[in-house]
A protein has these predicted regions:
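Active-site-proximal or metal-binding-adjacent scaffold patches in catalytic folds
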Residues: 281
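Catalytic core of IPPT-family isopentenyl/dimethylallyl transferases
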Residues: 320-333, 337
Length: 343
């Protein structure tokens, strides 16, 4: 554990905490956010919170509302906005706007932000710090685990999510966001650079994978900028990156979603194999392919989202797509593949 500039919160390895200390980068992250209201995930010592409070205190946002984002999403293509990264940023900034910072900045301390800004933090030490230095959060400060939290009812309607996600649970956070995609039209977050590149990757390279497909099915991805390890205390061993997810126009996949997930996971689980070979275990488990000496149950089929009818097992359908490896397939390709494998 290490103290952040001698202040009250210790960075805990068990929580994957690396506190962002670069104020310029903190401002850039907040400036990238377009919608409101906002849920901040893992505020820590409030490096983003300090810039969110004046922006959201009066119910106004320098960006658009989630309604505006929803309108934009309706006109955006599902797979647009995969952009490249600007250069790395690293710089120190002004005094954070904690209790002393507000006084020195000359800005009027804003009123409560609870209706427009909520923050969920699992670390008790950070919660105590935030209560002391950011009282305007009020009831909007929630002590708890985001992964176990029911997001419905937090706000009257849709809301944006912002945060510096812990590296060790970033994938779990994204899967929860996918499950709540109708509530969350926008996400601005900082994650491990390698994961950010994977998420924003187009089909083809080996970095393209499960999370790429699942997120791009519902969101347009923008890689905004890279952040060096020197912007944190303690500094991580890897670089970080900031990305923005904006809900695309897709309202449904047009195929069985459970089977779609099973196909994607199975295909990338043996990504060095062609789909013809990698998908065999999935269909065998569901009773769609014969396998000597094995009895296929309806429960096994249900786990895969497939039907285990009593009819004779069918082979994998023919076609050139089955000679490809999974990284060559776009979201639409996986949807088409799922439809071809649907009983």
């Amino acid at each position: 554990m290490s103290y952040l500039r001698g202040m009250e919160v210790r960075a805990k390895k068990s929580l994957g905490q690396h506190f962002l200390t670069d104020q310029d980068i903190a401002r850039r992250i907040v400036d990238a956010l377009q919608g409101s209201p906002v849920l901040e995930v893992g505020p820590g010592m409030g490096v983003l919170t300090q810039y969110l409070i004046p922006r959201l205190a009066d119910g106004a946002s320098s960006g658009g509302s989630t309604d505006a984002l929803r309108s934009e999403a309706g006109s955006a293509s599902p797979d647009s906005s995969l952009r490249s990264a600007p250069p790395t940023c690293s710089a120190s900034g002004p005094l954070p706007l904690t209790s002393r910072g507000w006084l020195r900045s000359g800005l009027a301390r804003p009123a409560s932000t609870a209706r427009q800004l909520k923050a969920i933090e699992i670390d008790k030490e950070s919660v105590a710090y935030l209560k002391k230095h950011f009282p305007e959060l009020g009831d909007g400060l929630i002590e708890g685990d985001f992964l176990k939290m029911d997001l419905r009812g937090l706000f009257p309607g849709q809301f944006s999510i912002i945060g510096n996600f812990p590296y060790n649970i970033s994938s779990q956070i994204f899967f929860k966001i996918i499950d709540n995609r109708d509530l969350v039209p926008e996400v601005v977050c900082m994650i491990q650079k390698e994961v950010a590149e994977r998420i924003a990757e187009k089909p083809g390279p080996k970095t393209y994978g499960i999370l790429s497909v699942f997120l791009q099915a519902w969101y347009n991805i923008e890689y905004l900028f890279t952040v060096g390890s020197g912007a944190f205390n303690p500094p991580p061993k890897v670089q970080s990156a900031v990305i923005r997810l904006t809900r695309n126009s897709r309202t449904e996949l047009g195929c069985d979603e459970k089977l779609f997930k099973a196909v994607v996971k199975t295909a990338f689980g043996q990504r060095r194999k062609t789909l013809r070979n990698s998908l065999k275990p999935l269909l065998q488990k569901a009773g769609r392919l014969s396998e000597p000496g094995r009895v296929h149950s309806r429960s096994a089929a249900a786990e895969c989202g497939l039907s285990s009818a009593a009819a004779p097992a069918n082979p994998i359908p023919e076609g050139p797509v089955f000679d490809l490896r999974p990284e060559r397939l776009s979201v639409e390709d996986f949807i088409d593949l799922t439809l071809r494998l649907t009983p």
